């Protein structure tokens, strides 16, 4: 029959409705088994509508689509039936998913789990596959497989398959016991004694743990300590009348003491940062108190360090403050022992550790062991501080160890006794510098072995206290010992860096620590070795000048180790460096020309900071026409002008003279090989001269601008400022500008 206008589309609509009804019935139906590979997406990547839906309907699992699917698929199971899934493992430990874990532990049953770690899908986020039974079975023991050795390690599928069939990482865990661990992490490997430890005191009852400052603009408020003017910094001696204060900010793997890299602007009780709307300054109660600090975000093993009085701390380096000071070193030792990693890897093995999770750490105080633990812990802090302070990146650095060792060389008897103590015999040495290195090497080895022995003894004590003899052993691997062994090339390079510091007056052979890092210059500090007068040290590819960096190094070595052993010391340095060259001076010259500034930038940086050099390299380009170092803290508006007139123009005259000499040799020599060599060198010199003239044109704009720098602005800002003329144009005259200076504001 005919179709009226009223019935048009009714059949299509009915078909769509029937489809929706089918879907609804399917979703409402209960199943014996539900299996899925869920979508992985955090709520931050999804729309506001999806977020709102998740909060309303899945408040327990709302943080990720994959965990929402866990909750939803369980609801689709009949009682006593099964849900199985492959998922990423973040839900097993993070506090964000604590409610979901508790819900499953209390209401359902983990039948089995394959905790695969990373590698199943390449360099992934990790994988876990599991079966959960709907409904709780009391005292049920689930079967778990842990198919990775180290958190974060990426292993091949073949390796995991081999481990699986060899029954590696097989655990049987009673689910009701797992629920007793605070935060309900799925720590299926936890033993009875491990779980029992949580029944006593925890860190939260013995300490105040504070998150600290959240500046929300690190470039504005934070500096690496050596960027700032020393007179405006409260470093070794606490003072409330300064601008820059030490700030714990986490850092890499280091136990007991160290990672003291940053200072924060806290002038006038933090007025600047308090006035920044986005910032929060945390709790006032323990500001500047001594405590224990750690790194919140790290993929490596988490480490804990003593924090002296006078420090602030931010979110990346929270600090806890022990109520009873007599327990501080005991608690530090517990966290720094194998116990620390063992418990924290159960509480949260992820890269980010929350403060509440640290508060759950169980602390068992054994009074009979308190004195011994306290003694060993303090000794470890002292040794690690000595190690940290032996390098110039510590603000408590006094003198380079290879220089301090030289002061005792006059006493041959005591030197021989020290050698016999460290080595059991008197090793041969080619020069005074080698003797100093051997003494330093012995000292480092002794410290390393003593710290390792102390840590193993602390491990033994805490393993016994917590009853974990079946799970942990006290032995410590060399790679996990914080203090550094001697390293010839590293230590010779650091000696050259210290020598350059003496050339600029940052250090003095007559006073310990920083001799000058801003403020008023005091010439009385420099008697044995006089620093460069105008703060410019040229680096040349040949011996053109009598005041270049190699000449100055030779003068410095004579003062430190004696003039009669200069050549032997130069040979020792050159051999350690391993650079190209036919003579010791040439090898050292090539190091300064090609590698010193790279090493300096690497030394004066920490993870995430970018390069923050304090000795700046004026560099004309690839031809090495002109290179000179300038010390940031001695810079004045006249520095560039002096550098241009007294050094750059001087090098141009040198090149012109040498070009004429090569031409004269070509014109008058009858030796073909000599003529060819002169021609080749003339071409090189011509390129260097051309580069210098082009560089002179750029640097003249900056010299005329007489640029002022403010140390408070930091290296990144000042590196750009120094290369920006009065007319606002940028002239690149410093090395590696792209990777050092702050990005241009658009």
Each predicted region: which residue ranges?
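Short Ser/Thr-interspersed hydrophobic loop/turn segments at strand-loop and sheet-helix junctions
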Residues: 248, 285-303, 313, 331-345, ...
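Terminal accessory regions of large proteins
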Residues: 393-395, 401, 406-435, 442-467, ...
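Short coil/turn segments at secondary-structure boundaries
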Residues: 8-13, 205-220, 236-237, 259-263, ...
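C-terminal, active-site-flanking charged/polar segments
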Residues: 129-136, 326-328, 338-341, 352-353, ...
